[in-house]
């Protein structure tokens, strides 16, 4: 998943207040970007398991996506 998509799924989940219709990989990415340990727990994943489950090419974008979301970047 590229940076723009990681930001997009995180913002979508943030707006909904949950991961809703997102795929498992997208949901885990959103939870990691938004630092939502409660969502990981609800999905029965640890941080390590989530990192193992998401696409390998997504991992380098997590910190940048979190920074962009925290700064109010809106992909839409």
Give, region by region, the residue ranges found by the protein language model:
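Charged, low-complexity intrinsically disordered segments and flexible loops
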Residues: 1-30, 34-76
